[in-house]
């Protein structure tokens, strides 16, 4: 399985790093992709991250080889993600093909930007739910069809494990849980 992890200046540091880390522990190939042209990219708490690739360097055929995508939160980062027309096009294309769309914290509003959340159950950071035309649930993590959402940084591990379970099954999820001493 292959996932695109999109991020931008101001994306939430821990949500991004924890999710990428746990997906890679599950042997999911994760390509970190900056929608910015800056390198490194400064995340919301001034941690600088060098992307594997910049979105401007990826062709559509290469992008379409991936099985899904991940979007971290962070107020400024989410605003910057929404500014990328190319990212919006990729999200729509992935949804049309029922590929995984995963977003945490304020990032479900990026999915809502193209009405993808309409009629779907979701969770997000408190206060952002009004920007999403979907069915809000005040829970830590949620899956509805091909969409996985997480409420906040506090739920980053649960969010990552739900993505792993969705893509690879419960055995892979349990293996990662055991490896991080989540379930002893």
Predicted features by range, described:
Residues 4-5, 11, 26-34, 53, ...:
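Active-site-adjacent pocket-lining segments in enzyme domains
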Residues 18-28:
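A short, Lys/Arg-enriched amphipathic alpha-helix followed by its capping loop at the start of a domain
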Residues 20, 39, 108:
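Short glycine-/small-residue-rich flexible loop motifs, especially phosphate/cofactor-binding loops
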Residues 33-54:
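N-terminal beta-loop-helix "entrance" segment that forms/cooperates
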């Amino acid at each position: 399985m292959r996932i695109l992890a999109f991020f931008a200046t101001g994306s939430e540091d821990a949500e991004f790093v924890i999710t990428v880390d746990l997906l890679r522990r599950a042997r999911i190939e994760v390509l970190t992709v900056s929608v910015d042209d800056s390198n490194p990219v400064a995340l919301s708490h001034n941690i600088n991250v060098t992307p594997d690739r910049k979105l401007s360097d990826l062709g559509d055929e290469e992008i379409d080889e991936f099985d899904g995508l991940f979007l971290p939160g962070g107020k400024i980062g989410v605003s910057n993600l929404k500014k990328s027309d190319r990212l919006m096009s990729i999200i729509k294309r992935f949804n049309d093909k029922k590929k995984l769309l995963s977003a945490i914290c304020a990032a479900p509003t990026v999915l809502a930007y193209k009405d993808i959340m309409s009629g779907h159950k979701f969770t997000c950071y408190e206060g952002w739910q009004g920007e999403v035309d979907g069915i809000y649930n005040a829970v830590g993590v949620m899956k509805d069809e091909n969409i996985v959402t997480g409420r906040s940084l506090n739920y980053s591990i649960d969010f990552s494990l739900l993505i792993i379970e969705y893509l690879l099954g419960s055995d892979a999820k349990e293996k990662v849980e055991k490896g991080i001493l989540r379930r002893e």
